[in-house]
Amino acid sequence: KITRLNVDKAKAIKGVHTVYLFKEVAGTTVKEVDGKEVVDDTNATCNYDGELVAAVAAETADIAEDGVRAIEVAYDVLPHVVDETDLEGGRAAKRMKYDRDSGEEVPIVDRTVGDPDKAIKEADVVHTGHYGIHTISHMCLEPHGAHCTWDESGDGPTLTARHSTQAVSTTGAQFAGHFGLDAGDVRVICNYIGGGFGSKFAADIWGWAAAQMSKDTGRPVRLMLDRATELKTPGTRPSGFANVTVAATKDGKVTAWKSEHWGTDGPKGGTIDGNQMPYVFDPPNKHVISRGISTDCGPNRAWRAPN
């Protein structure tokens, strides 16, 4: 939780034009709940390492970095869970999915076909094993980001966003909605993209930030995530771990499959899709159960599209 956030020194640096805040100090926002005013620290809480707090627009990248270093920020560390492999740790921390009424843990998928226990007992060969793969970043060669400019010369403001995106046709509406523009007043350009793989379908908060800083300064603003932030913030592929039992006949015919899966897709508490397991094979007897751990790590995004 952010307890202090001071950008005055950053703004005072020669060559710095503006500072954009993604977050605020705890206690800043108050909302009414059941007729009472309560503090809402949602936007004062960083949910994972790498979540954006502030951005600086300056004459050069070096000056912008000086501005970022001049920002004073302090945090209170909150309880957190980051070990995606530790199913029992996730349970102990109450980071699984639970039924609202009973409080019982609820699997994401719990599917049985046939009688896998009987098939395993009668099989000629039984193999058990533990398998898994950790969360993986998309590793886009070109990081996420945008270059934004405004034109105030016409009847109303228009925005041009040169955006690293797989979705030129839809991100314009996201910029328009955020800034209260007509869709026709936003132009999105992406002549090439240095990798997206399913992770570049949104205007994103950094795109909005670039556009807002451009609007505030009356100058073009280019905001691209640095490599460290690129690996943490704009989405990853969920992790998946599994204890698997496979049964077969002597001639190699698979007769049964049992698997218990878990992993994380970040704060939402999902994992890989258990409904797709076992992939390719379709044994006549199977039981698949999957659970997700809600972790204080970056969120997931689609993993696909060889571009």
Q: What does each of the following model-derived ranges do?
A:
Residues 24-26, 53, 61-63, 132-134, ...:
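Short, glycine-/Ser/Thr-/acidic-enriched flexible segments
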Residues 92, 157-159, 254:
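Hydrophobic residues embedded in beta-strands of well-ordered beta-sheets
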Residues 18-22, 48, 127-131, 161-163, ...:
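General beta-strand structural signal in soluble alpha/beta enzymes
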Residues 1-105, 126, 206:
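Flexible, low-hydrophobicity surface segments
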Residues 1-22, 54-75, 145-217, 263, ...:
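Alpha-helical support elements that line or immediately flank enzyme active sites
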Residues 35-67, 197-250, 300-307:
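Glycine-rich and small/hydrophobic secondary-structure elements
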Residues 103-146, 239-307:
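Glycine-rich loop/linker segments at domain edges
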Residues 2-3, 29-30, 64-67, 137, ...:
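Short helix/loop capping segments that flank catalytic or ligand/cofactor-binding pockets
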